[in-house]
């Protein structure tokens, strides 16, 4: 296993910062498993089943992940108005590869190499994914009294078909720190009083490596003349029209504290809706394929109130 990170940050002019970072992670493991020969017997010592064969399994797995981020920030104040700007770009990549080999009927249970097996078989798998993002943020603060923030992300994922690969996800939040207003000075028992609201969208790309692709299965042999011929066949249907799953969240809340923060109160109303959820919907058996294609076919809503009172 290797896990490392490096970064470089410079400030070419006052209040302007430029930072680049790179993180890399590599994981690898190997395992060998053995199953000794065993023939179950009844109470009279007669064999009652079992192959009488021993088995050996040799497995290998490796995974690589890396991320590169490049971020520029700038901030300045003018007569109590504070502005913060952020502009960034990131690249992410990950892949994995696995191989499993199995041997059976070895001359001894003590042999742990596949060359000693009478017959062997192997299977493997590999996949990769990449995500490229651009993002920006503007933050405004006036004397900790009026607060506002706007964010925008542009994500491009290899897990989504090319025609819908790019998604835009904005968010905005505002706050009013009422306790900082001059007219609140006569209410000395109120230590804190803040109203806030936010709305934003996020995209979900954790939907498998190739949910839009058509899969081909091996082992579909057929007869041509007097000969058995190896063949392939479609094992799952493709849907090149799938798109990002998107979650939109709205939150409106109030934070309050009384008697020098001895009593605290937080209240929130939230509304969350996830749209275009990917599902595998049933298809008619006459199609002849058992694995259904992914479809953006569902949505889920959550709505409610949250209260917290502390002393």
Regions found by a protein language model. Give the residues of each.
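Extracellular/periplasmic, surface-exposed regions of secreted and cell-surface proteins
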Residues: 1-35, 46-311
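N-terminal, polar/charged subdomain of small-to-medium soluble alpha/beta proteins
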Residues: 35, 40-41
